[in-house]
Amino acid sequence: MNLKEVSELRRRFRMDRNAISRIYGCFVNSSREIVSYIDESMGILPQDEAEKYLNLLKKTLSGKLWKNLIDIIFSTEQVADSDEHRLLMALRDSQLKDGDIREEFYQKIINSLDLGDSNYLILLTHDSYDVPRKNKNDEMDADASDAVFSYVVCCVCPVKERKVELGFFPGDNEFHSCAGQIVAAPELGFLFPAFDDRAANIYNALFYSRKTDEIHQEVIDSVFHTTAPMSAAEQKEAFQNALSEALGDACNMELVQSIHDRLRDQIEQHKESHDPEPLELSVSDAAAILRDNGVEEEKILAFRDSCATQFGDGATLNPANLIDSSRFEVKTADATISVGPEHSYLVETRIIDGRKYLLIPADEDIEVNGFGVRVKGE
């Protein structure tokens, strides 16, 4: 799915734009026991409660592609005949109305999910979307539809204990101490099937993880029985390892600055283009950056081999997963230097009297803990 398709579905999660009739779910305690079930009609829920349910489910379609939103791809064999795909199709085709199917799905989540000692809420809903056609100007015609996109959305929300506070009890006309439990934003969730080319793709699902470095592979294994792509944090670490292992001493400050600047430029240009498809970087593209910086062909070949080992043959990466385009940071054991990414060139490395130094020009005013200071010898 691309950004436009995700955004199109996100807009469904408003009171006046969806065909959601019921919200299903269950509340699970830290001992993996179901405490209570949810089976609520959207038509009779107070509007503020209905909107809160919709907002929680909509979060499952938020974040960045390839970071928070990850494509789950089923094999042809799984789609043809597998328990995991059959269950997901049954959830969708029954519109979640079959309680036994819902229970089987809940148990898959409960038996696999690791949220520590947290209680949590599993939410499920089904929607049918009359997909409007687009005219010659790529504008949607709300009155024309050729297909209905039937899909389910699931999210898992931690339920957190609220600290004890004083509260007013109208029945007693008094204040008493009170506590409660609050449903937090979803930790994970998914959409099935995927909405590719504005149509159902039963070979894919879209998985959501709030944390980009912890995508809950245990749930992906249980529900989808497949291996998810590397998380953003894993991609970054693997890319850094491939560079440092292959380049050795050639992996210096100037080279890393150049790589950061080139990737940042690609990210900025992609944003300006408003291209809904995720930005991709091939290993050949990364190798070309090294070549432009004078890296020896032998080391470039070693880098390509390392990438093949880390990511697999023919892998494509998202530059936004490899660098933080909003800053340029240099760390030593005792200090951290952070500069605006457009000024990364200001940071230099020097060896003076046998010691390594980081140098930054100080042509403008200098502040230390908010105090303006001067340089000795000015």
Question: Where are the model-predicted features located?
Answer:
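Soluble regions of membrane-associated proteins that transit the secretory/organelle pathway
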Residues: 3-6
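C-terminal, beta-strand-rich globular interaction domains
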Residues: 277, 286-378
